[in-house]
Amino acid sequence: NYGPYQHVEKFIPRQITSIMEGARPKLYGTGENVRDWIHTEDHSRAVWAILTRGRIGETYLIGADGEMSNITVLRMILQLMGQPEDAFDWVRDRPGHDRRYAIDASKLRAELGWSPMHTDFASGLRNVIDWYAEHRDWWASAKEATEARYRAQGQ
């Protein structure tokens, strides 16, 4: 997922905050890992729908049909932040890094009437970039420790 208040160790905030600090973002492996990106507000609304309208004992998967590769997301971030789309460094992949997270949220939509409100990923990403720009005091102290840990792992 993506949204405000996400720790700087996570993919999207790590890329955004690296660019804000004048550093080149890092991309694991080939960058072809795919995630179903869902805004945190939509995720929270889905959890609430399950808690208040879901049937006890049922399993509901939460997804927003937002599948996109990491390299596509990073290039979008770079573009939105006025950087060349190749202004990043490749790093070795994490051990056990999942290639794709596939989510079928059709049951959640059909049975509980939930659907995502944040369907324009670029617009949502722009808002997240703005949030991190306005809340540097929230993330800056965690950034160096996070990057030091990644450097120690060669990432």
Model-found features: residue ranges?
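Flexible, glycine-rich beta-alpha linker
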Residues: 1-11, 34
